[in-house]
């Protein structure tokens, strides 16, 4: 007889899957940034290693204006391929309190 998997177990398994997927995502984003002369910056639960079963991946994109759209598209696709929900913002749009809040936890991928 199959063991019944509880909701808490399913949530824990999904959180772990997301944590592992973020590790793979880091490699892909770093490789892209190095090849295209920009950088991605992770923050939030993905940067802290505290992904939950429903966490998204917070990414700042810091590329030249001519490369920004392609870098953004790459980050989106890379997240979707790993069944992660991206929350992407251009680094240039980060101002004031938001920047102050996320700066301590930023992980630069370049």
How would you label these PLM feature ranges?
Residues 26-57, 63:
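Active-site nucleotide-donor binding segment shared across nucleotidyl transfer reactions
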Residues 46, 94-95, 106:
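Short, flexible active-site-adjacent loop segments at beta-strand->alpha-helix junctions, enriched
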Residues 1-41, 77:
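Helical scaffold of the NTase/Pol beta-like nucleotidyltransferase catalytic core
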